[in-house]
Amino acid sequence: VKPSELLPYDLLIPSRESRKGEIDKWFEGTGRAPVIRGRIAHMMNAYELSLHGVGISIYPASISSLIRDKDVCVREVAHPDAHASYALIWNKKHTLSHVAEEFIAYVKEESGQQVYYA
């Protein structure tokens, strides 16, 4: 789904301000602002609201693994900026468990990203 195709609809988006800013950027090229009907903290609440016709929810794709209802449609947003960025944060002075060290190594390897230390 292209962001411009969402303009006629009421949208339900995550409550975090950073997510609203990201979603607003998807619509910059359209010359129009989306109609944000609600900002919902929990994606399952947004799912229920969408199920009952309140609006279209914009949430991480991971919610699709939780949905078993045939009355709900899940589509990917087709925009280069339609992705979430995350950071791993840990205390440098704290000794991490073996599992934590392995997880960090895995993330570094899979992402190809450099780890930055503050």
Show where each model-derived region lies.
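Short coil/turn segments
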Residues: 1, 10-20, 62-64, 79-80, ...
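Beta-alpha-beta core module
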Residues: 5, 44-93, 102
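Secondary-structure junction motif
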Residues: 9-30, 96-100, 104, 114-118
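Short beta-strand-to-loop elements that line the ligand-binding cleft
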Residues: 13, 32-45
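Active-site-adjacent beta-strand anchor residues
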Residues: 13-16, 39, 57, 89
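Short helix-capping segments at alpha-helix termini
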Residues: 31-32, 67
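C-terminal alpha-helix
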Residues: 106-110
